[in-house]
Design a protein with these regions (language model features):
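Active-site beta-alpha connecting loops in nucleotide-dependent enzymes
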Residues: 119, 143, 150-218
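Short acidic-hydrophobic, aromatic-tinged amphipathic segments that line or gate anion-handling sites
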Residues: 223-228
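Acidic, Mg2+-coordinating active-site environments of NTP-dependent enzymes
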Residues: 1-134, 213-216, 222
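Structural beta-sheet core signal
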Residues: 18, 39, 163-165, 192, ...
Length: 265
């Protein structure tokens, strides 16, 4: 209801842009009385339709079909962004959709997306060591983790994928542990770091070791527990070499841990 109220407060001369790849959004748009919105995504009903995705190691490429009421259908071909993952493609499509409705030319839109430098802590390449590439990402929610790992798997098909995960907030992990435990299916291994409590004082309420076992069961991956960043460094020095992708995930201190790994390995 809050989302519906928010969208219906957009004035008549404005527009909302809604990704209908999300099942909740599909339900929301059925209930919106004021139809001043556009839809986008891979869903075939999208007015800005993402098609023909080509996922490579350094970038994503796709076509964007534009199907707006009262206008001729058009396509922007070979849209390229220097980012990987469907979540980034959706974000780029949202930005493109807004600029298209503002009358910006397709040429400028393609150029702008191609030259976009990204943002910090979103699949940032940190360093390479013994053929292993290390990345840092802010993902700290089950859906984010799934999307990032899906993108990594599509881009790096031959490499072993290792996720270094630091849960953020005890309460979030406790409430969503089932969702979290199923989020790592596209990884080969998970290195589970201590929870970043973010000021929370209450007890965990379940055994962390059992959470590790739950990941093994639900995501079908190997799980390693480390107690601090120095143990992580020791593990990395002994095990992380060869063609591997190591991606740190979390909203806490894991970013610093990943950036200090070169000094520990």
């Amino acid at each position: 209801k809050s989302f519906i109220d928010f969208i219906e407060k957009v004035p008549s001369f404005g527009k909302s842009f809604i990704c209908i790849d999300d099942k909740n959004n599909n339900e929301i748009i059925k209930k919106i009385k004021i139809k001043n919105f556009y839809t986008y995504g891979t869903n075939l009903k999208s007015q800005f339709l993402i098609k023909n995705i080509n996922q490579l190691k350094e970038f994503s490429e796709f076509n964007l079909d534009i199907r707006l009421p009262g206008k001729k259908n058009t396509t922007i071909k070979n849209v390229r962004i220097p980012l990987i993952g469907l979540h980034n493609i959706r974000n780029a499509t949202a930005a493109a959709a807004v600029t298209i409705t503002l009358g910006i030319s397709k040429k400028i839109i393609k150029q702008g997306l191609r030259e976009f430098k990204g943002v910090q802590r979103r699949f940032n390449k940190i360093f390479m060591h013994r053929e292993t590439i290390f990345f840092d990402d802010y993902a700290h929610h089950p859906t984010e983790i799934k999307e990032v790992l899906n993108g990594v798997k599509q881009a790096y098909k031959e490499e072993e994928i290792i996720c270094v995960f630091q849960p953020h907030r005890i309460s979030r992990l406790k409430d969503l542990r089932n969702e979290f435990s199923s989020s790592f299916r596209k990884a080969d291994s998970v290195i589970l770091c201590p929870i970043y409590a973010a000021g929370e004082k209450k007890k965990l309420g379940f055994k962390y070791y059992n959470f590790a076992k739950q990941i093994i069961k639900n995501s079908k991956v190997r799980v390693y527990l480390v107690k601090d960043q120095y143990q992580l460094g020791k593990f990395a020095k002994q095990n992380l070499y060869g063609k591997k992708i190591v991606i740190g995930m979390g909203a806490g201190s894991i970013s610093n841990w990943m950036r200090e790994l070169p000094h520990l390995v």
